[in-house]
Amino acid sequence: MAVEFRSMARRLTGAVMITCMMGAPLAQAQTAPTLDPLVIAEFGTPPDIPTGALSDSVQAAVKTTFIDSVTGGRWGRDQSVGLIEIAESGDPRLVWLISDLMRFASSPQLHNALSAAASELLGKPFQTGNNWGDVTDHLLAWDVPAPPDYLTAKRAIFTEIIQGWDRIFVEGDIDWRLVSWGGVLIDDRPFDTTDEPCNCIPAADNPEVTSAEEATWLDDDDVVFGVEVNGEYRAYPRQIMEVREMVNDTLGGRDLGIPYCTLCGAAQAYFTDDVPAGVERPILRTSGLLSRSNKVMYDLNTYSVFDTFLGHAVTGPLAEKGVKLKQATVITSEWGAWKAAHPETTVLKERYALGRDPDFRNGRDANGPIFPVGDVDPRLSVHEDVIGIVTGTGTPVAFQRSAAVAALTRGEDVTFEDVRLELDAAGVKAVGPNGADIGSHQAFWFAWSQFHPGTALWPQQ
């Protein structure tokens, strides 16, 4: 593998031979991660992982290879030499930086050189055609630690290549290993100017709505995400949400931020008016980043990053204030059933779909997740729909949607601890002991189980 890697480096630089002297490595303990046998069966045995600081020469190679290459806008002989030193360091932690640069590498030669370096360090060939995804899946599944001072180099890569992320890549309660580029730019347009075009996933602020009778453009079998607040109902058509992915709205006298992660199959509704004193209403936007295939949202006012799936701020001023957004229930239904159950509903106007109807679920995602997710809890298939909720005791539980609908249709009770499921407009919601809304939503199994590892599952598998 080392010969193959050096050969690639020579082709990149045009040199006949590249040699480099490695500095003496620091004394480092070698540890092999302890993993579930199912992970090893799928991904193989992980390499030994060193601990401790990088040697001076490897630190210099990291700077040359990953920082200077993007700040200088070129890949030359020095970078190829640095990549060889990194590949020969025996430190798989450095593959996280290789993965980060691979995500942006448009040159097949550079991509192949980075892939060869990853193969050298991980002890596995990567020849899938999506080597970045395959490499990253292994890093995730094996839970390979990040190298020392990881954020500094990662920040340089991401902020030099994509403008607008300088205030995003900061220290916080976030595992930066999991964050990758989603292929789009940040949506940083000012609040209530979301009709302006952008090279981003365009949020919709204060969207115009119509009555159900006026929404003749919707077919009865079109999927909608239904929300009720203080007796007011609104439908957010999936074909709009697949284009917008974020809505800042007001319903029932409450301010809401509604992200939809197409990759996770999860539409969620967060109350953005219930925040600590002195905190301005968060205006939620799409960053263009992903965390293990879940969209990364942030607050436009403070650039505080949120864990989109869990609703708490993980960086910035809002994280310092401990902001965690409460959820309203989102019911995944069909337009015909929703308007029949709630004829007074309003619905977003057709123009917010921007003339598109991508139907990602039956197209792009038909063969599984398109971004790295690592190992997935094997109790259900990755794209199985579940209804997720955290009980009063703090226990996360996922209800298999198909099984729950069948049981409820037969008149059976579907319960777990203090949570009970109910049918609503051919969709499913979870309620508490007194029938109160407790903020449930639908998602793909792989997403729910990754953000709630060890989650309870109904019915038990």
Predicted regions span which residues?
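Bacterial N-terminal signal peptides
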Residues: T13-A24
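Boundary at the C-terminal end of the N-terminal hydrophobic targeting segment
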Residues: A27-T31
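Bacterial N-terminal signal peptides that target proteins for export
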Residues: A2-T13
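Mid-to-C-terminal functional-domain signal that highlights helix-capping/loop sites
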Residues: A32-G52, D56-V81, P92-Q461
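Exposed boundary/loop context
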Residues: S7, V16-M17, V296
